[in-house]
A protein has these predicted regions:
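Generic non-transmembrane alpha-helical segments
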Residues: 38-53, 106-117, 203
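Intrinsically disordered, low-complexity linker/loop segments enriched in Gly/Pro
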Residues: 17-75
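Short acidic, S/G/P-rich loop/turn micro-motifs used as interaction or catalytic elements
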Residues: 9-10, 96, 191-196
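A short, glycine/acidic-enriched catalytic loop
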Residues: 10-34, 143-162
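Acidic, Ser/Thr-rich low-complexity intrinsically disordered segments
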Residues: 121-191
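Active-site-adjacent mobile loop/cap segments within catalytic or ligand-binding domains
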Residues: 61-118
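C-terminal accessory extensions appended to soluble enzyme cores
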Residues: 180, 195-230
Protein backbone atom coordinates (compact mmCIF):
# COMPACT_ATOMS: atom_id res chain seq x y z
CA UNK A 1 0.00 0.00 0.00
CA UNK A 2 1.51 3.34 -1.03
CA UNK A 3 0.18 6.83 -0.33
CA UNK A 4 1.79 10.00 -1.69
CA UNK A 5 0.93 13.36 -0.17
CA UNK A 6 0.74 16.23 -2.62
CA UNK A 7 -0.92 19.55 -3.41
CA UNK A 8 -3.75 20.03 -5.86
CA UNK A 9 -4.26 22.92 -8.27
CA UNK A 10 -6.12 23.71 -11.45
CA UNK A 11 -8.02 26.49 -13.18
CA UNK A 12 -11.42 25.13 -12.11
CA UNK A 13 -10.32 23.19 -9.05
CA UNK A 14 -12.44 23.61 -5.91
CA UNK A 15 -10.99 25.28 -2.84
CA UNK A 16 -10.61 23.83 0.66
CA UNK A 17 -10.52 20.17 -0.29
CA UNK A 18 -8.77 17.08 0.99
CA UNK A 19 -8.72 14.61 -1.88
CA UNK A 20 -7.68 11.04 -2.48
CA UNK A 21 -7.57 9.35 -5.87
CA UNK A 22 -6.48 6.09 -7.41
CA UNK A 23 -3.57 6.01 -9.84
CA UNK A 24 -3.77 5.28 -13.53
CA UNK A 25 -3.54 6.84 -16.96
CA UNK A 26 -7.07 6.55 -18.30
CA UNK A 27 -6.38 7.51 -21.95
CA UNK A 28 -3.71 4.83 -22.39
CA UNK A 29 -5.48 2.22 -20.26
CA UNK A 30 -2.72 1.60 -17.69
CA UNK A 31 -3.81 1.34 -14.06
CA UNK A 32 -2.26 0.67 -10.66
CA UNK A 33 -4.07 -1.69 -8.30
CA UNK A 34 -6.83 -0.07 -6.24
CA UNK A 35 -8.03 -1.71 -3.02
CA UNK A 36 -11.65 -0.54 -2.58
CA UNK A 37 -11.75 -1.07 1.19
CA UNK A 38 -8.57 0.87 1.91
CA UNK A 39 -9.54 3.57 -0.60
CA UNK A 40 -12.89 4.01 1.15
CA UNK A 41 -11.22 4.03 4.57
CA UNK A 42 -8.90 6.82 3.47
CA UNK A 43 -11.73 8.94 2.08
CA UNK A 44 -13.74 8.52 5.26
CA UNK A 45 -10.71 9.20 7.46
CA UNK A 46 -10.12 12.49 5.64
CA UNK A 47 -13.79 13.37 6.14
CA UNK A 48 -13.59 12.61 9.86
CA UNK A 49 -10.34 14.55 10.26
CA UNK A 50 -11.98 17.67 8.83
CA UNK A 51 -14.33 17.68 11.81
CA UNK A 52 -11.60 16.79 14.27
CA UNK A 53 -9.42 19.73 13.22
CA UNK A 54 -12.35 22.15 12.85
CA UNK A 55 -11.69 22.82 9.17
CA UNK A 56 -14.84 24.81 8.51
CA UNK A 57 -15.87 24.85 4.87
CA UNK A 58 -13.54 22.01 3.89
CA UNK A 59 -14.65 18.88 2.03
CA UNK A 60 -13.21 15.40 1.59
CA UNK A 61 -13.63 14.01 -1.90
CA UNK A 62 -12.33 11.68 -4.57
CA UNK A 63 -10.93 12.72 -7.92
CA UNK A 64 -10.89 10.93 -11.23
CA UNK A 65 -8.19 8.30 -11.59
CA UNK A 66 -5.04 9.90 -12.95
CA UNK A 67 -1.26 9.89 -12.81
CA UNK A 68 0.88 13.01 -12.55
CA UNK A 69 3.73 11.26 -14.34
CA UNK A 70 2.04 12.09 -17.64
CA UNK A 71 2.84 15.76 -17.02
CA UNK A 72 6.53 14.87 -17.34
CA UNK A 73 6.22 12.61 -20.40
CA UNK A 74 6.78 9.41 -18.43
CA UNK A 75 5.72 6.09 -19.91
CA UNK A 76 2.41 4.96 -18.34
CA UNK A 77 3.40 1.34 -18.91
CA UNK A 78 5.65 1.66 -15.87
CA UNK A 79 2.50 1.64 -13.71
CA UNK A 80 2.26 -2.10 -14.35
CA UNK A 81 5.51 -2.60 -12.44
CA UNK A 82 3.94 -1.60 -9.12
CA UNK A 83 2.15 -4.58 -7.53
CA UNK A 84 0.56 -2.71 -4.61
CA UNK A 85 -2.33 -0.21 -4.48
CA UNK A 86 -1.28 3.41 -4.88
CA UNK A 87 -3.12 6.64 -4.11
CA UNK A 88 -2.42 10.35 -4.06
CA UNK A 89 -3.69 12.40 -1.13
CA UNK A 90 -3.84 16.11 -1.89
CA UNK A 91 -4.64 19.43 -0.28
CA UNK A 92 -6.25 21.90 -2.65
CA UNK A 93 -6.39 24.08 -4.40
CA UNK A 94 -4.49 27.31 -3.68
CA UNK A 95 -1.47 28.45 -1.65
CA UNK A 96 -3.81 29.47 1.18
CA UNK A 97 -5.03 25.89 1.50
CA UNK A 98 -1.65 24.27 0.88
CA UNK A 99 -0.11 26.17 3.78
CA UNK A 100 -2.95 25.60 6.25
CA UNK A 101 -1.30 23.71 9.14
CA UNK A 102 -4.59 22.21 10.30
CA UNK A 103 -5.17 20.72 6.85
CA UNK A 104 -1.73 19.12 6.99
CA UNK A 105 -2.53 17.72 10.43
CA UNK A 106 -5.81 16.33 9.12
CA UNK A 107 -4.02 14.45 6.34
CA UNK A 108 -1.45 13.05 8.77
CA UNK A 109 -4.21 12.01 11.17
CA UNK A 110 -6.19 10.30 8.42
CA UNK A 111 -3.23 8.19 7.33
CA UNK A 112 -3.11 6.27 10.60
CA UNK A 113 -6.76 5.22 10.23
CA UNK A 114 -6.56 3.64 6.78
CA UNK A 115 -6.61 0.11 8.25
CA UNK A 116 -9.33 0.72 10.85
CA UNK A 117 -12.08 -1.12 8.97
CA UNK A 118 -11.58 -4.39 7.10
CA UNK A 119 -15.03 -4.33 5.49
CA UNK A 120 -14.92 -4.92 1.76
CA UNK A 121 -17.48 -2.59 0.18
CA UNK A 122 -19.36 -3.31 -2.99
CA UNK A 123 -17.15 -2.15 -5.85
CA UNK A 124 -18.17 0.05 -8.76
CA UNK A 125 -16.14 0.90 -11.85
CA UNK A 126 -17.29 4.47 -12.46
CA UNK A 127 -17.36 5.58 -16.10
CA UNK A 128 -18.06 9.08 -17.37
CA UNK A 129 -18.74 12.29 -15.53
CA UNK A 130 -16.31 15.02 -14.55
CA UNK A 131 -13.08 15.10 -12.57
CA UNK A 132 -14.81 16.01 -9.30
CA UNK A 133 -18.10 14.09 -9.45
CA UNK A 134 -19.85 14.37 -6.10
CA UNK A 135 -21.84 11.15 -6.59
CA UNK A 136 -18.59 9.16 -6.65
CA UNK A 137 -17.35 10.72 -3.40
CA UNK A 138 -20.63 10.66 -1.53
CA UNK A 139 -21.38 7.00 -2.15
CA UNK A 140 -18.12 6.17 -0.39
CA UNK A 141 -18.93 8.41 2.56
CA UNK A 142 -22.43 7.12 3.31
CA UNK A 143 -22.89 4.39 5.94
CA UNK A 144 -26.15 2.78 4.86
CA UNK A 145 -24.72 0.59 2.11
CA UNK A 146 -20.89 0.32 1.85
CA UNK A 147 -19.83 1.04 -1.73
CA UNK A 148 -16.69 2.48 -3.33
CA UNK A 149 -15.83 3.58 -6.85
CA UNK A 150 -12.40 1.95 -7.01
CA UNK A 151 -11.37 3.48 -10.33
CA UNK A 152 -13.06 6.57 -11.79
CA UNK A 153 -12.80 7.10 -15.55
CA UNK A 154 -14.04 10.60 -16.46
CA UNK A 155 -15.71 11.29 -19.76
CA UNK A 156 -13.00 13.54 -21.22
CA UNK A 157 -10.31 10.87 -20.86
CA UNK A 158 -12.53 8.07 -22.07
CA UNK A 159 -13.08 10.17 -25.21
CA UNK A 160 -9.40 11.03 -25.68
CA UNK A 161 -8.50 7.38 -25.02
CA UNK A 162 -11.08 6.16 -27.56
CA UNK A 163 -12.98 3.88 -25.17
CA UNK A 164 -15.10 2.41 -27.95
CA UNK A 165 -15.09 -0.90 -29.77
CA UNK A 166 -12.54 -3.60 -29.04
CA UNK A 167 -9.86 -1.13 -27.92
CA UNK A 168 -12.20 0.54 -25.45
CA UNK A 169 -13.36 -2.80 -24.07
CA UNK A 170 -9.75 -3.89 -23.52
CA UNK A 171 -9.03 -0.70 -21.57
CA UNK A 172 -12.15 -1.11 -19.43
CA UNK A 173 -11.10 -4.68 -18.70
CA UNK A 174 -7.67 -3.42 -17.63
CA UNK A 175 -9.27 -1.00 -15.18
CA UNK A 176 -11.48 -3.74 -13.73
CA UNK A 177 -8.57 -6.19 -13.53
CA UNK A 178 -6.56 -3.67 -11.50
CA UNK A 179 -9.07 -3.93 -8.64
CA UNK A 180 -8.27 -6.90 -6.35
CA UNK A 181 -11.34 -9.10 -6.05
CA UNK A 182 -12.91 -7.59 -9.16
CA UNK A 183 -15.89 -5.29 -9.56
CA UNK A 184 -19.54 -5.74 -8.59
CA UNK A 185 -21.09 -3.18 -10.96
CA UNK A 186 -20.43 -0.48 -13.55
CA UNK A 187 -21.91 3.00 -13.54
CA UNK A 188 -22.15 5.21 -16.61
CA UNK A 189 -22.97 8.90 -16.95
CA UNK A 190 -26.11 10.24 -18.62
CA UNK A 191 -24.07 12.62 -20.78
CA UNK A 192 -21.82 9.98 -22.30
CA UNK A 193 -22.24 9.33 -26.01
CA UNK A 194 -23.83 6.04 -27.02
CA UNK A 195 -20.61 4.27 -28.16
CA UNK A 196 -19.04 4.74 -24.70
CA UNK A 197 -22.16 3.50 -22.92
CA UNK A 198 -22.26 0.52 -25.27
CA UNK A 199 -18.78 -0.67 -24.33
CA UNK A 200 -19.67 -0.34 -20.63
CA UNK A 201 -22.76 -2.47 -21.23
CA UNK A 202 -20.66 -5.01 -23.11
CA UNK A 203 -18.26 -5.44 -20.19
CA UNK A 204 -21.14 -5.68 -17.71
CA UNK A 205 -22.71 -8.41 -19.84
CA UNK A 206 -19.44 -10.34 -20.06
CA UNK A 207 -18.93 -10.15 -16.29
CA UNK A 208 -22.63 -10.74 -15.56
CA UNK A 209 -22.81 -7.73 -13.24
CA UNK A 210 -25.29 -4.83 -12.95
CA UNK A 211 -24.87 -1.58 -14.83
CA UNK A 212 -26.71 1.62 -13.98
CA UNK A 213 -26.66 5.40 -14.32
CA UNK A 214 -24.32 7.33 -12.04
CA UNK A 215 -27.23 9.15 -10.40
CA UNK A 216 -28.12 5.83 -8.73
CA UNK A 217 -25.02 6.29 -6.57
CA UNK A 218 -26.69 9.25 -4.86
CA UNK A 219 -29.42 7.19 -3.16
CA UNK A 220 -28.31 4.28 -0.93
CA UNK A 221 -31.67 2.50 -1.20
CA UNK A 222 -31.73 2.70 -5.00
CA UNK A 223 -28.05 1.77 -5.07
CA UNK A 224 -28.65 -1.36 -3.01
CA UNK A 225 -31.51 -2.38 -5.30
CA UNK A 226 -29.39 -1.79 -8.42
CA UNK A 227 -26.37 -3.63 -7.02
CA UNK A 228 -28.41 -6.67 -6.02
CA UNK A 229 -30.37 -7.05 -9.25
CA UNK A 230 -29.80 -10.27 -11.14
Amino acid sequence: MLFRSNWHAGAKAPEKILTVHSIGDVPSGWFCPSDPGLYRNMLRALHNAIGKYDLEGWTACTEATHWSGMLYDNDPAMLAACPVPQYDIEIGSSPVSWTDPEAAKAVADALVHVFDDDTRPKVVLACGGVHFESAFSNCGLQDEYPVMCAHILPNQWMVSGQYTGAEGLAKLKAAAAAIPGGIDAISFHDNQAAPYKDVCRQLAAELNIPIFKHRTLRDPAKLRAAMEQK
